[in-house]
Amino acid sequence: MKNFKINFDMDGTIANLYAVEDWLPMLRAYDPTPYAKAEPMLNMSAFARLLHKAQRLGYEVCIVSWLSKTSNEDYDNAVTIAKLEWLKVHLPSVEWNEIKIVAYGTPKHEIANGVLFDDEEHNRDMWGQGAYEPCEIMEFLRGLK
């Protein structure tokens, strides 16, 4: 299965952005703080071990995440930095094969392939076969051969 990609959304999938108090007013005020403060939604030690196993088996592990709907160039840069830092803090041992942080609303099925874990039903519907809800991440990774 070489080069088969396993893609993870961040917000609402591995990072609990929507549980950060006042996240929406902060994003609307061009404040990237919620992206940095979001708590992990998984046991990150176990998740990292399974990602390493996937890579040893020949799979690529990737991030495909949107920027904020509230957007300008400076804010997009700040959000990108916050998301990259979040990954370094919570998954420091993972060497991602690809990280795509793209404009809000970018059709993910047009910029990535393989499987997708995403909390947004529309993204999963557009992706088609191989799209999963976040609650299926660990079971999927444990089943890789």
Spell out what each predicted region is.
Residues 64, 101-104, 134-135:
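Conserved beta-strand termini and adjacent loop/short-helix elements that scaffold enzyme active sites
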Residues 84, 93-114:
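Donor nucleotide-activated moiety binding/catalytic core segment of transferases
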Residues 5-7, 11-86, 90:
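Alpha-helical substrate-recognition element adjacent to the catalytic core
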Residues 73-74, 107-115, 142-143:
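Short, solvent-exposed polar/charged micro-motifs at secondary-structure junctions
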Residues 114-145:
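Acidic, Mg2+-coordinating phosphoryl-transfer loop and its flanking beta/alpha structural elements
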Residues 57-58, 88-98, 128-134:
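Structural alpha-beta junctions
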Residues 1-3, 58, 113:
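A general structural motif
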Residues 18, 67, 105, 120-121:
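Short, flexible active-site-adjacent loop segments at beta-strand->alpha-helix junctions, enriched
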